[in-house]
């Protein structure tokens, strides 16, 4: 789900490759109930980014209890720690292998799903983030 930063010709090629496979959806930008539905029913959330800020969609996906497959950029690995499948950025072969492994290993994906929501909600609990920020400001003002 979401827009594309890729070229129109690449998206056209992807859609052509996926034609006839009703498991693959190109939704474009979605929000609200439709986004909730997609997160709630995903088998695995994949974030193949080469560059990110704080990946809010990754936090959302994990909060819905999704197993995640992310590139090894620091912005992703610092979020997921050891609670996701990680592949080498820009390495299509590694991404393909890890995605295939996830499709083949239902138990592993199930374990990641079980851990995801509790882990991410504890790590990014708003009250704790505020407390840590205030403590940091307190240290710096001394």
Annotate each predicted stretch with a short phrase.
Residues 1-12, 25-29:
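Glycosyltransferase donor-sugar binding loop
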Residues 29-30, 37-42:
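Short alpha-helical donor nucleotide-sugar binding micro-motif in glycosyltransferases
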Residues 45-46:
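A short hydrophobic beta-strand element within the catalytic core of glycosyltransferases
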Residues 50:
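Aromatic "clamp/platform" in nucleotide-sugar-dependent glycosyltransferases that forms part
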Residues 67-70:
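Short hydrophobic beta-strand element within catalytic cores of glycosyltransferases
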Residues 85-93, 101-107:
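Conserved acidic donor-binding segment of nucleotide-sugar-dependent glycosyltransferases
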Residues 108-122, 132:
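A short, well-ordered alpha-helix in the C-terminal region of glycosyltransferases
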Residues 126-142:
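C-terminal alpha-helical cap of glycosyltransferases
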């Amino acid at each position: 789900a979401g827009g594309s930063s890729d070229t129109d010709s690449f998206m056209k090629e992807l859609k052509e490759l996926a034609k006839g496979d009703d498991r693959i959806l190109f939704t474009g930008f979605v929000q609200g109930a439709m986004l909730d539905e997609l997160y709630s029913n995903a088998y695995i959330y994949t974030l193949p980014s080469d560059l990110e800020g704080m990946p809010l969609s990754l936090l959302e996906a994990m909060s819905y209890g999704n197993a995640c497959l992310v590139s090894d950029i620091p912005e992703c690995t610092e979020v997921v720690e050891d609670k996701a499948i990680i592949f080498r950025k820009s390495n299509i072969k590694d991404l393909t292998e890890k995605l295939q492994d996830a499709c083949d290993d239902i138990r592993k994906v199930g374990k990641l799903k079980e851990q995801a929501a509790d882990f991410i909600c504890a790590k990014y609990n708003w009250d704790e983030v505020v407390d840590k920020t205030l403590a940091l400001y307190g240290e710096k003002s001394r």
